[in-house]
């Protein structure tokens, strides 16, 4: 595997929020199927780089208001140079996240550092794959499923 120090900000944000969620709600440690934080890109760029709606998804399970859950998650976030300030809680419990400028530039720096090896990996090596071409709707997002 090439020495690529590619920093995936989306995964890093997910890990940060997963840690905060489990810190705020230790009861989730006991679940057979642990809850996994999903980080999405908001449709409106004014809402930040990423958004998390886990508070809405967990409200019924935790028996709490989504906004209270969101506040607990944000309050439990560990210090990180990944985020630009405190994430914003919007609406009923959405958490909007802005990345620090340094976090964005680290991705570009890792691409240049990898040089010609950027994008190479060993996942799936030696196996055949089938690639299908789609007729995508240019006005909507592309998805699988």
Question: How would you name each of these model-derived features?
Answer:
Residues 1-42:
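Charged, compositionally biased N-terminal leader segments and the immediate start
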Residues 57, 61-62, 106-145:
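N-terminal catalytic cores of NTP/NDP-binding nucleotidyl/phosphoryl-transfer enzymes
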Residues 68, 80-90, 118-124:
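Short, flexible active-site-proximal loops enriched in glycine and acidic residues
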Residues 70-78:
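Short, well-structured alpha-helical segments that form the helix of a local strand-helix-strand
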Residues 78-113:
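Structured, non-catalytic alpha/beta "coupling" segments that mediate domain-domain communication
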């Amino acid at each position: 595997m090439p020495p690529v120090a590619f920093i995936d900000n989306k995964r890093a944000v997910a890990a940060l929020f997963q840690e905060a969620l489990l810190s705020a709600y230790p009861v989730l440690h006991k679940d057979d199927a642990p809850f996994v934080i999903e980080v999405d890109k908001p449709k409106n760029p004014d809402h930040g780089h990423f958004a998390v709606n886990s508070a809405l998804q967990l409200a019924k399970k935790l028996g709490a208001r989504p906004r209270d859950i969101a506040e607990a998650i944000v309050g439990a976030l560990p210090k990180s140079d990944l985020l630009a300030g405190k994430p914003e809680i919007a609406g009923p419990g959405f958490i909007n996240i802005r990345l620090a400028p340094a976090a964005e530039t680290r991705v570009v720096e890792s691409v240049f550092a990898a040089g010609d090896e950027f994008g190479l990996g060993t996942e799936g090596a030696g196996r055949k794959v089938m690639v299908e071409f789609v007729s995508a709707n240019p006005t909507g997002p592309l998805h699988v499923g």
